Structures are given as C-alpha cells and as structure tokens.
C-alpha cells in the first residue's frame, strides 16, 4: 500500500511512529497502550485493541526496527501473528513524503486460507488508514 503525504518526511514520521496516536488515524484501532517505559525504540512493546469486521481482538506488538525517519517495523505477537513495515521516502522537493506500508497477518485458524481471504480486506482497511493519516498530517491536525 502507498500514499503520498503533502508534508515533509519529519512531520510524517512523527505521526506514524507515535504509537498512541495511531488510534487517531487507524479506524479499526480502539486503544493503544505502550507497556515499555521510555521513548519508542527497538524492543518497545505495546498492546492495541483492534476491531476487524466487528470483532475486538487484543494485538500485542513489539517494535523490531526503528530507523527515523525512514523505516519502522513491528511484530504482532498475539492471536494474529505477522508483522508490519512502514517506509518513508522524501519527495523530490522535500515538501512531500512517499509512505509505503506492508503488513502480514496470519490468523490462528486455517492460517493459509484465512490469510488469503483476509488479505484483500485488510489491504483495503490499511489503505484507507494511510489516506486518513495523510490528510491529518497535511492539514496540520497531527503534531
């Protein structure tokens, strides 16, 4: 998934790498609690409650890569396993940012079939989230 954000890479990074702020731009995320004290770093753990297709699920995650302001990756350690990587690239003139998001979630039951069926649904949800964060950052609504 990809979106172009009409804002510099530093502003876009601040919004995407702020774990608690994800509840603002990720429609399916009901809550996010960072359980590791201190600033976000590799090894930081958090727990989200997400609603997918009307079902609330705990989603414990761990930050596994952090390269400000260009790369951020998490591992899902709960019922659904997998990982997500968000990469940022400054636009040619520095006033825009290209954001790419790759996410793999494997359900606990019939994992291959569930991932195959669920992937298009989740891709649509996550693409909408990217457009939402792009609008928020571009409008200055996320600090």
Language-model features, listed with the residues they occupy:
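Short beta-strand segments that buttress and anchor functional surface loops
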Residues: 44-51, 71-78
């Amino acid at each position: 998934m990809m979106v172009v954000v009409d804002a510099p890479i530093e502003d876009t990074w601040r919004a995407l790498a702020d774990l608690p702020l994800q509840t603002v731009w990720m429609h399916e995320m009901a809550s996010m609690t960072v359980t590791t004290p201190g600033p976000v770093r590799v090894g930081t753990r958090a727990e989200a409650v997400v609603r997918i297709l009307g079902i609330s699920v705990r989603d414990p995650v761990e930050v596994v890569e952090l390269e400000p302001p260009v790369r951020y990756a998490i591992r899902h350690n709960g019922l659904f396993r997998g990982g997500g990587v968000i990469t940022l690239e400054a636009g040619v003139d520095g006033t825009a940012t290209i954001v790419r998001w790759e996410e793999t979630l494997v359900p606990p039951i019939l994992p291959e079939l569930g991932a195959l069926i669920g992937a298009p649904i989740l891709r649509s949800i996550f693409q909408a989230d990217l457009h939402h964060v792009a609008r928020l950052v571009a409008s200055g609504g996320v600090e």
